[in-house]
């Protein structure tokens, strides 16, 4: 059985103080500063960004049992990103300040916006419990005609229960099971009300949860200024004043037909009308489900190339994903015209295309080196298509012919990060704020690939040219999952086929073919340094830098106490020096020689978002090249390998045979 929690709706800072003991459940406890405590702090710090990038609702976990922490975050639909993040940060801080040793807690916060956070040592997503519930009522009473008020009340709440339990918008999971409404009362008063269920409920469960909450409200709070009923899976609140931003553009709608009574006639029993209100929607939903099931099977037979993929963490219920024929791809790319070529990487060439419906896409024509069978290729493509995150490029479809394997991605208009970062005429468009936000976005994307997605994906070729920028300069990681799609085994720690870019690859990968999530961490560290300095790796092979690579150059600046000499001159006068130095510090921790000394992505995220967190002292990094007499012997020992194809620095390596 899932552990039970108490919810609360808050309206002001004073209420937060008055009710601060309510979020914590005194069931099981952890030791302060323990592994569980660290995991709790990490996942709470990650919730704001993940909730906003997953359409208002996100669930995830971090750590290994018995220190694994499960958490859910939610904002109401229509909430602006900054407001959502601010609300979730406030909720997280309240939990951290209040629940000092409890392993289970849940909090609702309601002010101008409303959000919820819940964490536990036990998985709870999808559970449905009506009890316990909690009642909060306003201290002031109101004067009005009781009979007229009850009539308005019943009609309004019945309408809201029906609307909330049927509002299953598939494009935004946070828009499910939510409604806000107003009604005119006697004596020129107005009744404001709001209902919300968590998106993991069924429509029938949401209906039942809200119906019970309305009944509870009638028992506790009628005759008061207002109040709230909160329980495990839903919340209901009504007031005589607009307590949320949703009411600023809302006017009272007419309440026509009187609904069935929601009041229990006998203790412990529902009225006939209430039972009907619960059963009828269930029957209707069941009929609709059966009709849709029959239609979907008929449709699937007619178009086998069309697939619907269920997603449980992306915030999207279904993903429309197509298998396209080669002729369609040829038409879209004008027969792979050179004028449409966007670039070329280790896995193949990329072209811009336009589908017949006008959608612009990026078409990756894979090189014919994969020994993977058609079915295996198709299976891996479908799996990778399930990865949905704001900071990942969307895979929209694929083409599979006897001699062709093609991937179709969303088209990202601002090209790749290196297009701006390494061009002296364009790098000024990336001020420090944009670069810092890009670092944060890449961090969230890799964290999703490593930990929060259905699959554990090691990118293996993380570099500036694989970071695309959308119209708002939000970074989107490209080429993720290519190891799976191309048939490179990611289940083993060693490989004879190295896919990566020299300069971004860590020592253990280049020399011994060993890879892990810490390989991506090393690449990310190099990428952070490039973002700060605005130069490619190979720029540091020039004689005037007195360094053989970027990592060596930065390490010498760090040990000499002059890290800010690394900063791109175009942003050096307008950057936040403390943020820059902290990012350099984090990057040096990422490029440590021993993979065990490199932080994981959840820790990196915490380092970026929590400036008060003390960072460890970095040691000499991997591929640090000593000066003078030691250099030749060092290079000989580090880079001796046999390889069939190898290029210098930033050219992708796709087929190496390490010692």
UniProtKB/Swiss-Prot annotation:
GO terms for molecular function: ATP binding; protein serine kinase activity; protein serine/threonine kinase activity. Its EC number is 2.7.11.-. It catalyses: L-seryl-[protein] + ATP = O-phospho-L-seryl-[protein] + ADP + H(+); L-threonyl-[protein] + ATP = O-phospho-L-threonyl-[protein] + ADP + H(+). Residues 336-613 form the Protein kinase domain. Gene3D superfamilies: Gnk2 domain, C-X8-C-X2-C motif, Phosphorylase Kinase, domain 1, Transferase(Phosphotransferase) domain 1. Its main location: membrane. It is found in: Membrane. It comes from the Eukaryota. The active site is at residue 461. Keywords: ATP-binding, Glycoprotein, Kinase, Membrane, Nucleotide-binding, Receptor, Repeat, Serine/threonine-protein kinase, Signal, Transferase, Transmembrane, Transmembrane helix. Residues 296-659 are cytoplasmic. This is Putative cysteine-rich receptor-like protein kinase 12. It comes from Arabidopsis thaliana (Mouse-ear cress).
């Amino acid at each position: 059985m899932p552990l039970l929690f108490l919810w609360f709706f808050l309206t002001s800072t004073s209420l937060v103080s008055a009710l601060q003991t309510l979020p914590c459940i005194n069931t099981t406890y952890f030791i302060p500063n323990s592994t569980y405590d660290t995991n709790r702090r990490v996942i709470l710090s990650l919730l704001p960004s993940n909730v906003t990038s997953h359409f208002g609702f996100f669930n995830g976990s971090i750590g290994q049992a018995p220190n694994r922490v499960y958490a859910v975050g939610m904002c109401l639909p229509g909430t602006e990103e900054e407001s959502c993040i601010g609300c979730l940060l406030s909720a997280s801080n309240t939990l951290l300040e209040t629940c000092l040793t409890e392993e289970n807690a849940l909090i609702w916060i309601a002010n101008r916006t409303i959000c919820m956070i819940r964490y536990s040592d036990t998985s709870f997503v999808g559970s449905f419990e009506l009890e316990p519930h909690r009642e909060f009522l306003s201290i002031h009473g109101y004067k009005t005609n009781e009979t007229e008020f009850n009539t308005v009340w019943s009609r309004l709440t019945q309408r809201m229960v029906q609307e909330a339990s049927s509002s299953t918008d598939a494009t935004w999971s946070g828009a499910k099971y939510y409604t806000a409404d107003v009604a005119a009362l006697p004596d020129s008063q107005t009744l404001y009300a709001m209902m919300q269920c968590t998106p993991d409920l069924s429509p029938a469960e949401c209906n039942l949860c809200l119906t019970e909450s309305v009944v509870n409200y009638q028992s506790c709070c009628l005759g008061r200024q207002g109040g709230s009923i909160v329980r495990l899976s839903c919340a209901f609140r009504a007031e005589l004043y607009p307590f949320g931003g949703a009411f600023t553009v809302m006017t009272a709608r007419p309440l026509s037909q009187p609904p069935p009574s929601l009041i229990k006639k006998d203790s412990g029993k529902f009225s006939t009308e209430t039972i009907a209100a619960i059963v009828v929607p269930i029957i209707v939903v069941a009929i609709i489900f059966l009709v849709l099931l029959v239609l979907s099977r008929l449709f699937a037979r007619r178009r086998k190339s069309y697939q619907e993929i269920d997603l449980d963490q992306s915030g999207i219920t279904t993903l429309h994903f197509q298998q396209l024929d080669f002729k369609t791809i040829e038409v879209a790319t004008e027969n792979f015209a050179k004028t449409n070529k966007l670039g070329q990487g280790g896995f193949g060439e990329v072209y811009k295309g336009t589908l017949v419906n006008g959608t612009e896409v990026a078409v990756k024509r894979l090189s014919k080196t994969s020994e993977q069978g058609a079915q295996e290729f198709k299976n891996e493509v479908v799996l990778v298509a399930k990865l949905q995150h704001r900071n990942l490029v969307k895979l929209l479809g694929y083409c599979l012919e006897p001699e062709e394997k093609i991937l179709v991605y969303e088209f990202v208009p601002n090209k790749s990060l290196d297009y701006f970062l390494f061009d002296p005429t364009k790098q000024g468009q990336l001020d420090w704020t944009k670069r810092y936000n890009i670092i944060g976005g890449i961090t969230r994307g890799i964290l999703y690939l490593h930990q929060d997605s259905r699959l554990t994906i090691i990118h293996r070729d993380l570099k500036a040219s694989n970071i695309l920028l959308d119209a708002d300069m939000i970074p989107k990681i490209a080429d993720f999952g290519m190891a799976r799609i191309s048939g490179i085994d990611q289940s083993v720690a060693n490989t004879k086929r190295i896919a990566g870019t020299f300069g971004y690859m860590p020592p253990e990968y280049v020399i011994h073919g060993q890879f892990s999530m810490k390989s991506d961490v090393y690449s990310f560290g190099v990428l952070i340094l490039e973002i700060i300095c605005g130069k490619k790796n190979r720029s540091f092979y020039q004689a005037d830098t007195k360094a053989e690579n970027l990592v060596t150059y930065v390490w010498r600046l760090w040990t000499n106490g002059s890290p800010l000499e690394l900063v791109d001159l175009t942003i050096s006068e307008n950057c936040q020096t403390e943020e820059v130095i902290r990012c350099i510090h984090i990057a040096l921790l990422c490029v440590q020689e021993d993979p065990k000394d490199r932080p994981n992505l959840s820790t990196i995220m915490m380092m970026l978002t929590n400036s008060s967190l003390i960072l460890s002292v970095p040691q000499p990094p991997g591929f640090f090249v000593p000066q003078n007499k030691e250099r030749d012997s060092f290079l000989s020992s580090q880079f001796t390998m046999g390889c069939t194809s190898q290029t210098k620095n930033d050219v992708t390596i796709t087929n190496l045979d390490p010692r």
